[in-house]
């Protein structure tokens, strides 16, 4: 028997039944328990969501920016009031430790809504003088109906990140969460309605990739914001372009390099490498999974990492002491185990972990040990391909130019980091690394003020920061002539 009642769609400010007749189950990855049966949206349901969003968006856009800002700030207050309740739900659905969801997932989502609520009144046009009798002014107008497609690793945070700038700019959003972690987006929809967002302005349609494809191809949707894998992102982008040339934001995968130089504080470097590989059980798109270490400090760095791996507390996500939970699904577990086996076969030296955990209460969950390979080479699969799990690959380098060249030798370009005691080197190296999100002597923080997104095949566009708001508006240019009109004929 499921823990929660059947999960329906959220359209027009209320729960509604899907018309497809199909459902799918969402499972607790720590126990294998069925959390809920979820209704799959049909094409008719997507159409209903679009029409509802069009109606709601007109009402929402007609409000003043200050009025929209107040509503969004109220949503932030409710999110923070319900932080613990939402964190518990997110932990059950994702398998993340409760200590993590309490501190990060809802809080960082609320921060982004608060940030854009503050910017809603700052959406301004320009006035451009042409001559004494004529000028141009520009207006930034909302796009209309936007769609967001979320990933399974940060369900409510991603829903907040995508909806906040859209709503602040006067748009409506139809959001499709991942079918692996579909629960918390519905709670966000409830909160938006309670805060005063008009019906239809934030709709949630559940389902698999078929639903995402319907959203990407719908001619009345003006923008798609997608978070997920590169290959799926390419398909979404293709559908978006072929249907109506809609604008896209793509936050895709990565195989990010972390460069540790021989002048680094190695204790700090080891701490950074641990966070960059094992936070959220390695299921973070920006993870620094290619750890390049300068030869002279390799042995010491390996010892420090091994010491820290032994301190990881793998356990039930609901236990406050746990800091490493299961992977999000059985499919992801099998994928990660396959990469671990590949690493062994290709000659990497297994320094820690490498096995599925099956004893006791671990047996029903999707647990894999935190895994560290060393002696890795650039052509190994575990070094080339995104694993999206707790697998660190340590590589050795000799000089700065070599490290930069090898770090950039990838189709990805999401994130990169440098650990060094030389500030000049830090900036010099960062400026040559081909990545959209970079850190110096730290890793992983993505505050609301910071634009995040990738180079190369890691994405298109940015989320968060000032510039993102511009991409949820379009510019209308208006010329005004105050003097006589000069006839042409």
Swiss-Prot record:
Cofactor binding remark:
Binds 2 potassium ions per subunit.
| A biological process term (GO) from this entry | glycine betaine biosynthetic process from choline
- Pathway involvement? Amine and polyamine biosynthesis; betaine biosynthesis via choline pathway; betaine from betaine aldehyde: step 1/1
State the EC number(s).
1.2.1.8
Function of the molecule: Involved in the biosynthesis of the osmoprotectant glycine betaine. Catalyzes the irreversible oxidation of betaine aldehyde to the corresponding acid.
Q: Which HAMAP family match?
A: BADH
- Name of the featured protein: Betaine aldehyde dehydrogenase
Q: Which organism is it from?
A: Paraburkholderia xenovorans (strain LB400)
Classification from the root reads: Bacteria, Pseudomonadati, Pseudomonadota, Betaproteobacteria, Burkholderiales
Q: Which gene encodes it?
A: betB
């Amino acid at each position: 028997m499921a823990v929660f009642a059947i999960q329906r769609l959220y359209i027009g400010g209320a729960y509604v039944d899907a018309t497809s007749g199909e459902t799918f189950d969402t499972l607790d990855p720590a126990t294998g328990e069925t959390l809920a049966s979820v209704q799959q949206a049909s094409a008719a349901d997507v159409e209903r969501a679009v029409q509802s969003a069009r109606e709601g968006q007109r009402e929402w856009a007609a409000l003043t920016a200050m009025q929209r800002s107040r509503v969004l700030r109220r949503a932030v207050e409710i999110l923070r009031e319900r932080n613990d309740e939402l964190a518990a739900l997110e932990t059950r659905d994702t398998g993340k430790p409760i200590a993590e969801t309490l501190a990060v997932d809802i809080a960082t989502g609320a921060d982004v809504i608060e940030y854009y609520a503050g910017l809603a009144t700052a959406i301004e046009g320009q006035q451009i003088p042409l001559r004494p009798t004529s000028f141009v002014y520009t207006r930034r107008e909302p796009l209309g109906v936007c769609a967001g497609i979320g990933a399974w690793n940060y369900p409510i945070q991603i829903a907040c990140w995508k909806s906040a700038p859209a709503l602040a700019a006067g748009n409506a959003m139809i959001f499709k969460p991942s079918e692996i972690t579909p629960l918390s987006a519905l709670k966000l929809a409830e909160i938006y309605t309670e805060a005063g967002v008009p019906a239809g302005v934030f709709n949630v349609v559940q389902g698999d990739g078929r639903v995402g494809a319907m959203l990407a191809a719908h001619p009345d949707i003006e923008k798609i914001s997608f978070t997920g894998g590169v290959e799926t992102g390419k398909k979404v982008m293709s559908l978006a372009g072929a249907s109506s040339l809609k604008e896209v934001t793509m936050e895709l995968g990565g195989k990010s390099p972390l460069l540790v130089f021989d002048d680094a504080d190695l204790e700090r470097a080891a701490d950074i490498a641990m966070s960059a590989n094992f936070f959220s059980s390695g299921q973070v798109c920006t993870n620094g999974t290619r750890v390049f270490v300068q030869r002279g400090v390799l042995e010491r760095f390996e010892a420090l990492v091994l010491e820290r791996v032994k301190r990881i507390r793998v356990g039930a996500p609901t236990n406050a002491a746990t800091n490493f939970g299961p992977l999000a699904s059985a499919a992801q577990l099998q994928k990660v185990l396959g990469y671990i086996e590949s690493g062994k076969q290709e000659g990497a030296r297994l320094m820690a972990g490498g096995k599925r955990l099956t004893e006791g209460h671990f047996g029903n969950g999707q647990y894999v040990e935190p895994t560290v390979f060393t002696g890795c080479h650039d052509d190994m699969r575990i070094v080339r391909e995104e694993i999206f799990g707790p697998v660190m690959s340590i590589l050795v380098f000799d000089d700065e130019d070599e490290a930069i060249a090898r770090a950039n030798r990838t189709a990805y370009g999401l994130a990169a980091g440098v650990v060094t005691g030389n500030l000049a080197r830090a900036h010099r190296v960062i400026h040559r690394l081909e990545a959209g999100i970079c850190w110096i002597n730290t890793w992983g923080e993505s505050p609301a003020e910071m634009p995040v997104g990738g180079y190369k095949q890691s994405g298109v566009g940015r989320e968060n920061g000032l510039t993102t708001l511009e991409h949820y508006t379009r510019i209308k240019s208006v010329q005004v002539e105050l003097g006589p009109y000069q006839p042409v004929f």
